[in-house]
From Swiss-Prot:
Annotated ranges, domain KH type-2: 47-118
GO MF, one example: structural constituent of ribosome
Protein name: Small ribosomal subunit protein uS3c
Cellular component, GO annotation: chloroplast; cytosolic small ribosomal subunit
S-S bonds: none
Family affiliation: Belongs to the universal ribosomal protein uS3 family.
Subunit structure: Part of the 30S ribosomal subunit.
Biological processes annotated in GO: translation
Subcellular location: Plastid, Chloroplast
UniProt cross-references to CDD domains, sorted A to Z: KH-II_30S_S3
Pfam families the record matches: Ribosomal_S3_C (PF00189)
Organism: Illicium oligandrum
Keyword terms of this UniProt record: Chloroplast, Plastid, Ribonucleoprotein, Ribosomal protein, RNA-binding, rRNA-binding
């Protein structure tokens, strides 16, 4: 059987960097990870509730977290900031209050910044959300995959592979369907590949979406 390594972990230190930057004592490490998860969940819930169109489409590419002794710096890389109802300044202020309440940390300041992603459809997380939305609306999975590939062409990517697994179209037996366009050299470490795995709940059960995007070669 083929052993599939995570493309992001495989390239750490070469073309990929960590999304979280902080240090902790071994006994406090698990608490730090849980704190990161709380911050991410809180931000995703807030963005979902405050979208102009209540579609469940968040458009968050990634959330970067940097921790110091007295400061937590959170950078949200978002694809479509104009979808948010509140103005940027007021929205960030409200979000900061929400996250601060959730964390319950008195000694540390929280600073949240929103950065717009230049080419949103070159981000696998945003593409996976788009496909998930299509599948929820009962669009044919092949049509959704082909449309996602068309969208990545706008972002000047060199290749993309999309895979959907589970009870596709409500069939009794689960299967895997995939489509590839261009080159996706998974074994080349210098190849800058972005990856995302995403689970979507449909009326037939949970489907898994995996996306690999080949951006460039160093």
């Amino acid at each position: 059987m083929g052993q599939k390594i995570n493309p992001l972990g495989f390239r750490l230190g070469t073309t990929q960097s960590h999304h979280c930057l902080w240090f902790a004592q071994p006994k406090n490490y698990s608490g730090g990870l849980q704190e990161d998860e709380k911050i991410r969940d809180c931000i995703k819930n807030y963005v979902q509730k405050h979208m102009r169109v209540s579609s469940g489409f968040e458009g968050i590419a990634r959330i970067g977290i940097q921790k110091k002794i007295d400061l937590i710096q959170v950078i949200i890389h978002i694809g479509f900031p104009h979808f948010l109802i509140e103005g940027r300044a007021r929205g960030i202020e409200e979000l900061q209050i929400n996250v601060q309440k959730k964390l319950n940390s008195v000694n540390r300041r929280l600073n949240i910044a929103i950065t717009r992603v230049a080419k949103p459809y070159g981000q696998p997380t945003i593409l996976a959300e788009y496909i998930a939305l299509q599948l929820k609306n009962r669009v044919s999975f092949r049509k959704a995959m082909k449309k996602a590939i068309e969208l990545t062409e706008q972002a000047d990517t060199k290749g993309i592979q999309v895979q959907i697994s589970g009870r596709i179209n409500g069939k009794e037996i689960a299967r895997v369907e995939w489509i590839r366009e261009g080159r996706v050299p998974l074994q080349t470490i210098r190849a800058k590949i972005d990856h995302c795995s995403y689970a979507v709940r449909t009326i037939y059960g949970v489907l898994g979406i995996k996306i690999w995007i080949f951006l460039d070669e160093e």
